Regions:
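Extracytoplasmic cell-surface/polysaccharide-interacting catalytic and binding patches
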Residues: 1-174, 189-214
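Short, well-ordered surface patches within globular domains
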Residues: 178-184
């Protein structure tokens, strides 16, 4: 873990593309000694959404691949475009409200699970929620994981925490943003353990749907 993680400024942002996220390096834990040395020198890390694998670190000297054949990684093009925008200064200063990522890939994955979007939405009462193009760091959850929220929600959460603290109450978040790929990964792991889609849906919302949006 980067030594400055706990003191990391709360204006940090996660930049989002379809398959890869751009994380501030101080917020990530190294999973191997070689990664630790690189992450200690990095300011940004490209992280695969499906399984959390670190794909590349961005150092002052340039891009450092952390996987073989980085150029062939699915979704690397849009992620590098985001990185170019970051280097060009487009993400400095007050940013515009985040737009939303397209949902085309999600529709295909729901079909692969045998789920009809409209039927599931009607049956569950849940709405399909597009991923935002970027998220704000709202602090850390109960397990000290970075808590990523939409900017307005991050401001509201921090204000609620401060107000509660004045009354002597400590508020902890359980979890924040989860990508569609992360949700899909939960399904894939449970399916591999022999559970059916119907059984998984008793515990987890379908990828792209959320019980925490209204």
């Amino acid at each position: 873990m980067h030594p400055s993680r706990s003191a990391f400024a709360l204006h940090a942002r996660l930049l989002n593309s379809a398959g890869i996220e751009l994380w501030p390096a101080p917020l990530l834990r190294a999973r191997a000694s070689a990664d630790a040395r690189i992450l200690a020198r990095a300011h940004t890390v490209l992280r695969r959404k499906r399984d959390g694998r670190y794909l590349a670190a961005v150092l002052d000297q340039g891009l450092w691949p952390l996987v073989p054949r980085l150029a062939r990684e699915a979704g690397i093009g849009p992620a590098l475009d985001l990185l170019d925008q970051q280097h060009a200064g487009l993400w400095r200063g007050p940013p515009p409200a985040p737009g939303e990522l397209p949902l085309e890939r999600l529709h295909e994955r729901l079909q692969a699970l045998g789920l009809d979007q409209a039927e599931y939405a009607g049956r569950s009462g849940l709405a399909l929620v597009a991923e935002p193009q970027w998220l704000a760091l709202a602090g850390f959850d109960r397990w000290r994981r970075p808590l990523w929220l939409r900017p307005g929600a991050a401001r509201a959460w921090r204000a609620m925490q401060r107000a509660a603290a004045l009354d002597g109450v400590a508020l902890d978040a359980i979890s924040g943003y989860r990508s569609h790929d992360y949700q899909l990964g939960i399904f894939e792991r449970k399916l591999a353990r022999g559970q059916s889609v119907a059984q998984i849906l008793q515990v987890n919302a379908a990828p792209g749907f959320s019980e925490h949006h209204g």
